């Protein structure tokens, strides 16, 4: 598992393909979020060894699809399908739990716009929206990001799609799970539970 993570990280650091200085479609991201007015991101908001932070600072190349003041969307350098893209916040948050709701909302608000363009451009039928949050879930780069993975009918991308699902048993175990989740939600500060109007 560790070797796989290292291989994926290396593929993000050294993407295969054209030399960025020769390919006019390859852009280096310029970062405006968290800036001090000169277009540079404050070092306290980014990590020196994070590949996504390097992209945001303009130190690593990327194929940029979209950018605004909160996030950018790039093509994944190790795609699961043609057009596999990543929406990345411009400030460094290692996991989804550590990412402020306003940043998550900004990223998610771009999904319809970006995914629609990707689906049309790739001739796909649909897409998966995915967040690998934590090592056990397959997160390799610890900078929050959302995957947009274009799909075509019968592409057999996920082996689990062929697995039969089991119906939820409405038993004591399920009731205990519901109670436990609700207890955890009730223990959160009220401002985390209030929905914006």
UniProtKB/Swiss-Prot annotation:
Transmembrane segments: none annotated. The active site is at 145 (tele-amp-histidine intermediate). It is found in: Peroxisome. Substrate binds at residue 147. Its EC number is 3.6.2.1. One of its GO terms (cellular component) is peroxisome. PROSITE patterns: HIT_1, HIT_2. Residues 51-158 form the HIT domain. Its main location: other. A motif (Histidine triad motif) lies at residues 143-147. It holds the Pfam family HIT. GO terms for molecular function: adenylylsulfatase activity; nucleotide binding. GO terms for biological process: purine ribonucleotide metabolic process; sulfur compound metabolic process. Coiled coil: none annotated. Residues 14-43 are annotated as: Disordered. This is Adenylylsulfatase HINT3. It comes from Arabidopsis thaliana (Mouse-ear cress). The gene is HINT3.
């Amino acid at each position: 598992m560790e070797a796989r993570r290292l291989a994926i990280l290396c593929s993000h650091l050294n993407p295969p393909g054209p030399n960025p200085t020769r390919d006019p479609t390859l852009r280096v991201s310029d970062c405006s979020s968290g800036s001090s007015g000169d277009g540079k991101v404050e070092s306290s908001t980014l990590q020196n060894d994070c590949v996504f932070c390097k992209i945001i600072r303009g130190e690593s190349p990327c194929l940029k699809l979209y950018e605004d003041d909160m996030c950018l969307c790039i093509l994944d350098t190790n795609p699961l399908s043609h057009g596999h893209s990543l929406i990345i916040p411009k400030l460094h948050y290692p996991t989804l739990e550590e990412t402020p709701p306003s940043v998550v909302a900004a990223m998610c608000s771009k999904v319809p716009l970006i995914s629609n363009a990707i689906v049309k451009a790739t001739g796909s039928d649909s897409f998966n929206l995915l967040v690998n949050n934590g090592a056990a879930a397959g997160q390799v780069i610890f900078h929050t990001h959302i995957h947009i993975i274009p799909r075509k009918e019968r592409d057999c991308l996920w082996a689990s799609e062929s697995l039969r699902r089991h119906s939820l048993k409405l038993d004591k175990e399920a009731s205990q799970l519901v109670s436990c989740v609700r207890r955890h939600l009730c223990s959160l500060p009220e401002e985390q539970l209030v929905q914006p109007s």
